[in-house]
């Protein structure tokens, strides 16, 4: 027990590369089981993710470097575009349709719930180009760590 009366000590986890991605690199910085995770995302200029939403994952992005074009549903079925710059924050709760495109090489910090493999692609709903990339996952494929 520490002097503050708790059986708790700081942890200093090692970063772990999730592996190279088509769009750049994803590095898992910290994973607190059943609570949250933090990642570093390096996204190459011109890279574009699929138009998607998450069933369970709640995520926040902080733009550290570069400019990112975000497309999102305004809640009325319309896709809106917004440019995020260093210091800007984007919050994507479960069900929020969104797509990212790197206008420059980007470095982003992502904090989110621990729902890996939670992705529903929805380009066809909005009549936009279907990109290559990771497909929709089923609810059974979502992994919570």
At which residue positions do the language-model features occur?
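Conserved hydrophobic/aromatic beta-strand scaffold that supports enzyme active sites
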Residues: 38-42, 60, 81, 89-91
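Beta-strand residues in well-ordered beta-sheet regions across diverse protein folds
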Residues: 39, 51, 63, 71, ...
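Histidine-centered metal-chelating micro-motifs
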Residues: 48-50, 69, 88-99
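Glycine- and acidic-residue-biased ligand/ion/polar-headgroup-sensing regions
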Residues: 55-74
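Short acidic-glycine-tyrosine-enriched beta hairpin
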Residues: 74-95
């Amino acid at each position: 027990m520490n002097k503050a009366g708790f059986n708790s000590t700081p942890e200093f986890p090692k970063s772990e590369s999730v592996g190279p991605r088509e769009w750049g690199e994803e590095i898992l910085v910290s994973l607190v089981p059943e609570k949250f995770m933090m990642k570093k995302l390096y996204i190459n200029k011109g890279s574009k993710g699929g138009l998607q939403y998450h069933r369970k994952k709640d995520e926040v992005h902080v733009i550290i470097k570069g400019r990112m074009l975000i497309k999102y549903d305004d809640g009325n079925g319309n896709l809106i575009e917004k440019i995020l710059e260093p210091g800007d924050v984007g919050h994507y709760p479960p069900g929020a349709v969104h797509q990212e495109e790197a206008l420059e090489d980007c470095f982003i910090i992502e904090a989110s719930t621990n729902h890996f493999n939670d992705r529903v692609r929805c380009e066809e709903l909005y009549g936009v180009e279907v990109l290559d990339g990771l497909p929709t996952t089923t609810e059974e494929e979502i992994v919570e760590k």
